[in-house]
Amino acid sequence: MTSQIKLIVGLGNPGPEYAKTRHNAGAWYVEQLARWHNVSLREEPKFFGHTARIQVDGQDVRLLIPNTYMNLSGKAVAALARFYQIEPEAMLVAHDELDLPPGIAKFKQGGGHGGHNGLKDIIARMGNNNNFFRLRLGIGHPGTKELVAGFVLTKAPSSEQSLIDAALDESLRATDILFKQDMTKAMNRLHSFKAEKV
């Protein structure tokens, strides 16, 4: 396998009241990735989340959606990464991104947490190692910092949700390129995509 990714994490909050909120964009991606590969996510208490395993060119890639609240995401990630001896450089973490508009998604390696509590906890629990890959799923920004908490915990209007969904679809295609070729080609594909309003 050309890709070195061995763990893909989708961030979100647990429970039906959060399932359709913007903050769960990362979890949506992993749910769709599991469907794409015809596997079911199942609860695994020792990893504090729902997990699945897919095979890419004979190599296992683990999928994880933490069952913890967003600000404790690192608990699940660290537990699974330690158990399977997966280094941060072999992890891809999908999360909602305020600094990108709906309809845009981008891969990135390393960097800070940008105020995202899920990323913040993962970095802390991975020994302050931030060198994992991220899939940043644009949800847009409400305009001021004070509005962010309410914004991420509400549903996007259908006009924005359709753009987010289109970017999720393209992210799945880019992930396929990542598996079959490499991150550079996957980035080139994804970073040239912009969903258009219907």
Swiss-Prot record:
Question: Site: Discriminates between blocked and unblocked aminoacyl-tRNA. Where?
Answer: N13
Annotated GO CC locations: cytoplasm
Location comes to: Cytoplasm
Which reactions appear under catalytic activity for this entry? an N-acyl-L-alpha-aminoacyl-tRNA + H2O = an N-acyl-L-amino acid + a tRNA + H(+)
Q: Where is the active site?
A: H23 (proton acceptor)
A GO MF annotation of the entry reads:
tRNA binding
Q: How does it assemble?
A: Monomer.
For this protein, the record's PANTHER family field holds: PEPTIDYL-TRNA HYDROLASE
Per its record, how is this protein called by name? Peptidyl-tRNA hydrolase
Organism, per UniProt? Answer: Aeromonas hydrophila subsp. hydrophila (strain ATCC 7966 / DSM 30187 / BCRC 13018 / CCUG 14551 / JCM 1027 / KCTC 2358 / NCIMB 9240 / NCTC 8049)
